[in-house]
């Protein structure tokens, strides 16, 4: 009788990938990165095990938004005090914190539980081309499609 293979957390081999966001559409790139973080592109993918790889995203400030989203898309934050709701447009967020904008896009595509939070820690986003992870020897990831 055959049984389905279930990956154990300690058996998972993790790689480091680097993704260049220059000229890429935000949502399409974020969904690709979320798949890598979850490990869905590996043959040993197991839903309840963090089998994903580390992802470094560079040039997050040069990511592309389609349509009129620079003006129309709004990010909300709240200070937890009465009247503490703050709004920021995507254009202002791209100028001020492009790394945070990409992180929020990917975070929304990961599971909303402790496993998703653990997967999110493997994402490293940088606005420019400089990053401190050269020692990990990341491989360049070619975007599908």
From Swiss-Prot:
Keyword presence, Ribosomal protein: yes
GO terms under cellular component: cytosolic large ribosomal subunit
InterPro entries: Ribosomal_uL13, Ribosomal_uL13_bac-type, Ribosomal_uL13_CS, Ribosomal_uL13_sf
GO BP field: negative regulation of translation; translation
GO molecular function, one term: mRNA binding
Keywords assigned: Ribonucleoprotein, Ribosomal protein
Quaternary data: Part of the 50S ribosomal subunit.
Assigned protein family: Belongs to the universal ribosomal protein uL13 family.
HAMAP family: Ribosomal_uL13
Function: This protein is one of the early assembly proteins of the 50S ribosomal subunit, although it is not seen to bind rRNA by itself. It is important during the early stages of 50S assembly.
UniProt name for this protein: Large ribosomal subunit protein uL13
Lineage: Bacteria, Bacillati, Bacillota, Bacilli, Bacillales
């Amino acid at each position: 009788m055959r049984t389905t293979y279930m990956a154990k957390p300690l058996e998972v081999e993790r790689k480091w990938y680097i993704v260049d966001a220059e000229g890429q559409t935000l949502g399409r790139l974020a969904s690709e990165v979320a798949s890598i973080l979850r490990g869905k592109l590996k043959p040993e993918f197991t839903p309840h095990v963090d089998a994903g790889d580390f992802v470094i995203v560079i040039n997050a400030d040069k990511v592309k938004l389609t349509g009129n989203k620079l003006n129309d898309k709004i990010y909300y934050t709240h200070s937890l005090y009465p009247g503490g709701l703050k709004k920021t447009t995507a254009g202002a967020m791209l100028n001020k914190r492009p790394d945070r904008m990409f992180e929020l896009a990917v975070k929304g595509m990961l599971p909303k539980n402790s496993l998703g939070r653990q997967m999110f820690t493997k994402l490293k986003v940088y606005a420019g081309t400089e990053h401190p992870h050269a020692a990990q020897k990341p491989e360049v990831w070619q975007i599908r499609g």
